[in-house]
Amino acid sequence: MSMGLEITGTSLAVLGWLCTIVCCALPMWRVSAFIGSSIITAQITWEGLWMNCVVQSTGQMQCKMYDSLLALPQDLQAARALIVVSILLAAFGLLVALVGAQCTNCVQDETAKAKITIVAGVLFLLAALLTLVPVSWSANTIIRDFYNPLVPEAQKREMGAGLYVGWAAAALQLLGGALLCCSCPPRDKYAPTKILYSAPRSTGPGTGTGTAYDRKDYV
């Protein structure tokens, strides 16, 4: 695996990891849906994993942390845990990638470095899945409630910027992890030693080169 490809994969994975952190902290997973009577509302409601914010038409914003985890819907409760695990897993993957990087001397053996890099790629792939699942789940819940006639218009929400950042984070980590998984150990480490065998040449009487035994062997 070339060093350029390794650096590209690590950079994409790190960028996806940073986007996951932004997605976790951004209080814009759900935003107010401007439909029906809510079109003329004077405030916008944002809902995130840790707090909700109310933005007035004057530009003033007030945010409040959730009083209880049980007050959150199921998708946001699961998203809290999965996103945090994804961030920690990607951070561990970054440390593993640095250990197995070609530009570091933590490990001298090239075969071991390649295996460590593959492990880092797998960790980034798992982190991407842990980000993709809650983001897609929350988006599905928002769309389902939006078209549900039993849900009041005041409670309907639209997808916020946090979901799009989460999808971008998952895509970057998937791509970066896939590139790191392409790291293969050097083939010469596993190639069997080639031993060349040569068949003994026999000389017969009809070859004109002498008998089976050389004359010089006799006195």
Curated annotation (Swiss-Prot):
UniProt tissue specificity: Expressed in the lung. Expressed at high levels in the liver and at lower levels, in kidney and testis.
The organism's place on the tree of life at top rank: Eukaryota
Name used for this protein in its record: Claudin-3
Its biological purpose: Plays a major role in tight junction-specific obliteration of the intercellular space, through calcium-independent cell-adhesion activity.
Topology, Cytoplasmic side: 1-8, 102-115, 181-219
GO biological process, one term: response to hypoxia
Extracellular topological domain residue ranges: 30-80, 137-159
Any GO CC annotation of this UniProt entry: tight junction
Cysteine disulfide partners in this protein: none
Organism of provenance: Mus musculus (Mouse)
Chain ranges passing through the membrane: 9-29, 81-101, 116-136, 160-180
A Pfam family this chain is assigned to: PMP22_Claudin
Residue positions, PTM Phosphoserine: 198
Modification sites for Phosphotyrosine: 197
